[in-house]
């Protein structure tokens, strides 16, 4: 939806004549496209799926869900990075903990702080997914439920490191010290 929003904006300023009478494209901006991404992130991902996993991890057998939890943190960091790159300052404080804000008027977190949170999420996940930190007990097997990497922890760690590099490149001109952490 982000790409569609930007395409509509660019198309509005471009000249496109189809050659047919009354067939010129319309580039009317529809709030639903932008709102869809926002709603999907906060309603579907943050408050239902991610929140449920966080609660399961903290109140059930941590060893059993260890791998699934930290893989999900990596994926959530990826979604969160796209959200802040699209909207800038966003509400994060409660959602990243898997909680609902106490009222509807949530506090927006400045984008610089969101990036700090992203680096913390990724650093923690990378550390916890190293072989020596994995619990000795049998893990919840993601297997076919992991559509990206089939539950391969090494591939998820590589993705997390790649995402860290991408985020570091994004902030390198604004905050070189943060980029080098």
Regions found by a protein language model. Give the residues of each.
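Aromatic-residue-lined binding/catalytic grooves and analogous aromatic/hydrophobic interfacial grooves
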Residues: 4, 119-142, 153-181
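Carbohydrate-binding/catalytic loop surfaces
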Residues: 100-101, 142-152
């Amino acid at each position: 939806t982000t790409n569609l929003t930007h395409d509509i904006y660019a198309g509005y300023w471009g000249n496109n004549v189809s050659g047919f009478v009354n067939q010129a494209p319309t580039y009317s901006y529809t709030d639903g496209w932008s709102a869809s991404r926002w709603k999907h992130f906060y309603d579907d991902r943050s408050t239902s799926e991610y929140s449920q996993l966080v609660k399961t991890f903290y109140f059930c057998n941590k060893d059993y869900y260890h791998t699934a939890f930290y893989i999900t943190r990596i994926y959530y960091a990826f979604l969160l990075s796209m959200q802040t790159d699209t909207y800038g300052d966003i509400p994060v404080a409660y959602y990243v903990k898997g909680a609902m804000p106490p009222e509807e008027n949530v506090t927006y977190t400045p984008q610089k702080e969101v990036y700090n949170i992203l680096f913390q999420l990724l650093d923690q996940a990378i550390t916890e997914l190293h072989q020596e930190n994995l619990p000795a007990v049998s893990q919840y097997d993601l297997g076919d439920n992991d559509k990206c990497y089939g539950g391969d922890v090494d591939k998820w760690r590589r993705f997390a490191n790649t995402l860290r590099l991408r985020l570091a490149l994004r902030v390198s001109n604004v905050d070189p010290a943060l980029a080098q952490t």
